[in-house]
Amino acid sequence: MIVPNLITTLDGKEVMVDFFTAEVTQNRTIHIIGEINDDTASYICSEIRYLSRNSKEPLTLILNSPGGSISAGMAIYDTLNASRCEVTTVVEGMAASMAAFLATCAATKGRRFCQPNAEIMVHQPLGGVQGQASDISIAADHINSTKRKMTKIFADSVNLEESKIKALTDRDTWLSAEDALKMGFVDHVGDPMDD
């Protein structure tokens, strides 16, 4: 990925930084682009902690991601909740799987945005395991527990019954920005800069 550099002022000095660093330090905006994995979660959680340690001003999370690891996504979700900052989420391109969870569930109610041509995709947790029958059974119990937990969080965030979330996530369900708005996955179609 090519990231442009900017000349900006940090701590009273002109410095050259990449665009994403400037977004974090000046606008309190964090970007999740690409797969959500342990490395990206570590980086994103560090940015959230840094920003929330210095101020309780609102944060913006911009997502264009196919999703990724449940544990990495939950680390970001928990860190955002612990920050006690108001969180705005903006879907650009797509937010699928764990990215859809973050776009919908990690934001402050009323602050969930989806660009007009962006899409959201939800589905049940994915997993794979091999080994002895007892190990496979333990793994199945774990993924079912994770599914129940995520279904409840989604239902609370979207204000739909858990049975409706279960039906939507049984298979891949793609939502246009307008459909996501109608179903309560986002609060606005457009950009928060337009507000």
Residue ranges and their predicted role:
Residues 1-195:
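Terminal-region recognition feature
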